[in-house]
Amino acid sequence: MSALWRGRDPNSACLARKGPGPRRIDLPKGTPPDCPAVRQSCDTSTMATASVLEREMFSEAEAARLLRVPQSTLHYWLDGGQYRRKTYKPVIRLHPRGDRLVTWAEFVEAGLLREYRRTHRVPMAELRTFIDLLREELGVPYPLAHQQPFVSEGRQLVLEAQDASGLEADYCLVAVTRGQLILTPPAEAFVERVTWEGDIAAGWRPHDDPDSPVRMAPDIRFGLPSVKGISTAVLWEHIDAGEGIEEVAGAFDLAVSDIHWALAYENTLHAAA
């Protein structure tokens, strides 16, 4: 029996969930501080009591749009469902929650599943078992939103979980090469997208291009994609309305290259819509 089976109760690691905060409006530099949009309030006590990973950030539809996966697929990963008269438990959540809100940790873990979904059908049962094993061993509800499984000392745990769950090679996160544990290409691509703070995923690069400065972070623009704190959607709207790139860059105190990156990212979203 794998060393991962230690009888831990995964429910003990689960934290209370809190509701998402209001969305912030991006304004050009020079906007008066008493502008109503600047005075939007946020329940900071709620933000403080919920961990970053457990914070509800997006509607299910918005998360699916940002991940560029069908909403039905994301819902299947989050809450499970039925396929050919067989009921499947969730892959990401411990239990179905029945709502349409997505936490930051759930979004990040769905980003990992997306890396595998590009070329394969995600095996629900095996991945569920695999994540359950990591959840039990690490004592956290969302183990793949933590850095530990991906660094050298945590890869042995991942290897054991892969073996114990019967996960096929196409879906493995680590592989043994010349006696060393290395990340598989999908896992490595995922890790490169994440900004780690300590052990947790504190940021995410939604753009496929590794050079892109577009980032998502739960404490910046309420998790929406941004460049240097300015929403890419807002920048795209200004350009779409006919404003010049240099004009928009100057208004938001950004480099022209930042605007180009924001447009490139937004164009991928609009193309996938």
Which residues does each predicted region cover?
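Short glycine-rich, low-complexity segments
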Residues: A3, D9-N11
